[in-house]
């Protein structure tokens, strides 16, 4: 069985960030591998953060309708639902490993989905 691959929010945001062409190209190269698509996993946190980031945090933000369509497209991939048990695990990991809660939650979602590879700029 091929490894499952979890994408952090920042990876997806760079796909739409024309102000950072080097990172944008890196993500385009990564996602040009169609074989990878069958192994991708996201989480509800990733979808939420993605929408906010591409509509509010980019120098040239996406219009809300384009961002909605992007989230709708991303939601076609397997999506880990963030539930109270993952939140509690993330709190524990964040305290023990001294990482941000949000990064710990990404990691817990990836682990819950059985991901063996996590793409992020935060780890």
Residue ranges and their predicted role:
Residues 1-42, 57-65:
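Short, well-structured N-terminal submotif of metal-dependent ribonuclease cores
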Residues 8-10, 49, 103, 122:
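Acidic active-site catalytic centers that drive phospho-/nucleotidyl reactions
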Residues 12, 47-48, 87, 112:
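Alpha-helix N-cap/helix-start and coil->helix boundary motif
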Residues 3, 77-121:
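Active-site neighborhoods of divalent-metal-dependent phosphate/nucleic-acid chemistry enzymes
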Residues 44, 120-123:
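Short secondary-structure boundary segments
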Residues 45, 51-78:
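Active-site-proximal, substrate-binding regions of enzyme catalytic domains
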Residues 11-13, 52, 86, 106:
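Hydrophobic side chains within alpha-helical segments
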Residues 15, 33-37, 53-57, 74-78, ...:
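Alpha-helix C-capping/helix-to-loop hinge sites
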């Amino acid at each position: 069985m091929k490894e499952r691959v979890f994408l952090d929010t920042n990876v997806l945001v760079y796909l739409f960030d024309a102000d950072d062409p080097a990172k944008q190209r890196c993500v385009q190269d990564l996602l040009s591998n169609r074989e990878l698509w069958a192994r991708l996993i996201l989480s509800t946190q990733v979808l939420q953060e993605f929408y906010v980031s591409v509509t509010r945090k980019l120098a040239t933000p996406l219009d809300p309708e384009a961002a909605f369509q992007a989230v709708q497209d991303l939601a076609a991939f397997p999506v880990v639902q963030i539930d109270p048990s993952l939140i509690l695990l993330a709190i524990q990991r964040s305290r023990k490993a001294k990482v941000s809660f949000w990064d710990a939650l990404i990691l817990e979602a990836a682990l819950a989905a059985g991901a063996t590879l996590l793409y992020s700029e935060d780890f």
